[in-house]
Swiss-Prot record:
Result when mutating E165Q: Loss of glucosylceramidase activity
EC identifiers of the protein: 3.2.1.21, 3.2.1.46, 3.2.1.45
Name used for this protein in its record: Cytosolic beta-glucosidase
Activity regulation remarks: Inhibited by 2,4-dinitrophenyl-2-fluoro-2-deoxy-beta-D-glucopyranoside. Inhibited by sodium taurocholate. Inhibited by alpha-1-C-nonyl-DIX/AnDIX. The glucosylceramidase activity is slightly inhibited by conduritol B epoxide/CBE while the galactosylceramidase activity is not.
GO biological process, one term: galactosylceramide catabolic process
Places the protein is found: Cytoplasm, Cytosol
PROSITE patterns per UniProt: GLYCOSYL_HYDROL_F1_2
Length: 469
């Protein structure tokens, strides 16, 4: 089961989740610094990313892990407030530039291609104080930051992700309030943030296109989180429609404007407009793009970056009471099949990724696809011999092989989440996704490979699985 020649085998991390050094060498505070320092049990045991894996000082150790796996690509993110402590180019932190230059140069020296994320949930606190993603002012701030990164690192970085999981960020931070700033705005904040995230991404893509592409010859996209969604009752028309609506609300709401035509899907617009009207709003809670903005947004991605972890069943749930919220707007309820195995929120459904990839191929004109995250957690304490978890990975690779061979999906890169056990947002250090175990009790933060790391290294060496379908 050999994958296509030149297939990219990667692992991923993100700045706040691994770096630590939260106030080292002139770094400014980000929203997760503020949020975790406030306590209040919003994060498991009030844990913080102040030290995390210590990657800010232990990059050499991370590099050893990368070399041990034989990765072809490594995806990491830049800390916006490490580079620009107040979020603006008014003051530039040279120590931050030096740190990322070293990572990029070391990767290239070792034949590893960097995939760099500009922004992975860790907004500079100064910009959150000015309204964050609910304010239109952020679009310009993000564009300036993106241009700064393109001009500083783009001579060597050719694969960029502007915004990580924009669809998760908008909902978790600004609708449900489970991520910083921690203030819920049910049924309004998520859409407002989505609107600004889409425009910020598009602006930065155009900046790359007009100012840097000719010389640097790179590619720019954003990454979107996607759960595959199946009708709970495959014979029920209302469940079938609900499953389609669910995918549209959570993936296409971002992907359709960017990849197809600059505007939100019709069903999203009509559902939210009709709910808003019933609730007595003077206009839809979903903001509208101007014709000018639609032109600006359309076609602003050079590849499709998707992050798949799990699948859910969907059934139709009429919003009789007119409650506010995104699920209520979509009129859906989601839940797992009781027969699926799970660790925490991740139910193991490897076939879901095959269906998702086919959906992206068919809906978005057969784009080049990167899976920029996929993985399985272990609960703490996690055994180093994680054979059960490796089995989930193996089944996933079989499904990817099928998608490439049978469905002719143009999948070019796979990133395992994550290189290291790390700070998993609200779950703190209780959920371990690493290919390498990190001992968070030991100040030296030693990295030790799980069985999965050794097995993944074999897959990379063979460019695929040894067994046949």
């Amino acid at each position: 089961m050999a994958f296509p020649a030149g297939f990219g085998w990667a692992a991923a991390t993100a700045a706040y989740q691994v770096e630590g050094g939260w106030d080292a060498d002139g770094k400014g505070p980000c929203v997760w610094d503020t949020f975790t320092h406030q306590g209040g049990e919003r994060v498991f045991k009030n844990q913080t990313g102040d030290v995390a894996c210590g990657s800010y000082t232990l990059w050499e150790e991370d590099l050893k892990c990368i070399k041990q796996l034989g990765l072809t690509h490594y995806r990491f993110s830049l800390s916006w407030s490490r580079l620009l402590p107040d979020g603006t180019t008014g003051f530039i932190n040279q120590k931050g530039i030096d740190y990322y230059n070293k990572i990029i140069d070391d990767l290239l020296k070792n034949g590893v291609t960097p995939i760099v994320t500009l922004y992975h949930f860790d907004l500079p606190q100064t910009l959150e104080d000015q309204g964050g993603w609910l304010s239109e002012a952020i679009i310009e701030s993000f564009d300036k930051y993106a241009q700064f990164c393109f001009s500083t690192f783009g001579d060597r970085v050719k694969q960029w992700i502007t915004i990580n999981e924009a669809n998760v960020l908008s909902v978790m931070s600004y609708d449900l309030g489970m991520f910083p700033p921690g203030i819920p705005h049910f049924g309004t904040g998520g859409y407002q943030a989505a609107h600004n995230l889409i425009k910020a991404h598009a602006r930065s893509w155009h900046s790359y296109d007009s100012l840097f592409r000719k010389k640097q010859k790179g590619m720019v996209s954003l990454s979107l989180f996607a759960v595959w969604l199946e009708p709970a009752d495959p014979n029920s028309v209302s469940d079938q429609e609900a499953a389609k609506r669910a995918i549209t609300f959570h993936l296409d709401l971002f992907a359709k404007p960017i990849f197809i035509d600059g505007d939100y899907p019709e069903v999203v617009k009509s559902q939210i407009a009709s709910m808003s009207q019933k609730q007595g709003y003077p206009s839809s809670r979903l903001p509208e793009f101007t014709e000018e903005e639609k032109k600006m947004i359309k076609g602003t991605a050079d590849f499709f970056a998707v992050q798949y972890y799990t699948t859910r069943l969907i059934k139709y749930q009429e919003n009789k009471k007119g409650e506010l919220g995104i699920l209520q707007d979509a009129e859906i309820e989601f839940f797992p099949d009781p027969s699926w195995k799970n660790v925490d929120w991740i139910y193991v459904v490897p076939w879901g990724v095959c269906k998702l990839l086919k959906y992206i191929k068919d809906t978005y004109n057969n784009p080049v696809i990167y899976i920029t995250e996929n993985g399985f957690p272990q609960s703490d304490p996690a055994p180093l011999d994680d054979t059960q978890r490796w089995e989930y990975f193996r089944q996933t690779f079989q499904e990817l092989f099928k998608a490439i061979q049978l469905d002719k999906v143009n999948l070019q890169v796979y990133c395992a989440w994550s290189l290291l056990d790390n700070f998993e947002w609200n779950q703190g250090y209780s959920s371990r996704f690493g290919l390498f175990h990190v001992d968070f009790e030991d100040p030296a933060r030693p990295r030790v490979p799980y069985t999965s790391a050794k097995e993944y290294a074999k897959i990379i060496r063979n460019n695929g699985l040894e067994a046949h379908l």
